[in-house]
């Protein structure tokens, strides 16, 4: 009966055992980088439940352990639904200046993504508010255009027709959504939004703005979505600065209130992009993220590899901004006819 003690030992060490209080497990997990969470979710049902709980996110806030993640939406040929991904750094990996064979970062798929494309994304706290094009049409069914992604539980929250908290009405030709006393949305083009939101004056087309009223008067802009895609070029806004990439002028910047375009200095070590490559920019916690692709010759040029670079920005003067390459990596292999839909960062 030698197996009996061994069974007892395995049972004692089982992840499902209640040897540790849930509060202690939450505190331990909250101190870890979320890059470990996908593998930890495989440990047990208890871990999966804790990793998807709001309590874990609140504990991360209390311990100042929040992180900023980039969420990317891609569409693929033959797939009716777009795919959503999170940019992760692989656990137990260290960056090095030496040439490496294995990728340190990757775009990990998000399960249970909504079956619609949402070109307009706004990050407010730990939530991503996704708006599809229907909001611009002003139809009575426009409320169906909103879906919410809870980044701490990693779940999409639809808005059921019988439980909608959104109120939609026409106000001087613009669409207005009141979610609560502290959060509202407006959808409008840049020219008509300018009188209400002067800080958003730019060359870009502002699609949706999230704001909340201040205690005294006025408003506070919480986030906004803009049309940042111009063919092979791309725009991105970070801390009142508009960054732009175009194959003919490379990387440049200008202040959102206007002014001349200036070249982004530095960027040593950033690979050259292929002529056919579509380059996209995104803000991730105040850093500039660049996404581009290359063909994979081994696939017979039927697949592409999506690459990603993270650039820290330093304002050395009013007329000079330097970009430093923190890292670049191959993050996802895709079919050659994939399309980039959008990207947005959120703090979780």
From Swiss-Prot:
Pfam entry (one): F-box
* InterPro entries, sorted: F-box-like_dom_sf, F-box/kelch-repeat_ARATH, F-box_dom, Kelch-typ_b-propeller, Kelch_1
Residue limits of the F-box domain? Answer: 14-60
Q: Which domain of life is it from?
A: Eukaryota
Against PROSITE patterns, the record matches this protein to: FBOX
Protein's UniProt name: F-box protein At2g20380
Tell me the organism. Arabidopsis thaliana
Query: The organism's lineage?
Result: Eukaryota, Viridiplantae, Streptophyta, Embryophyta, Tracheophyta
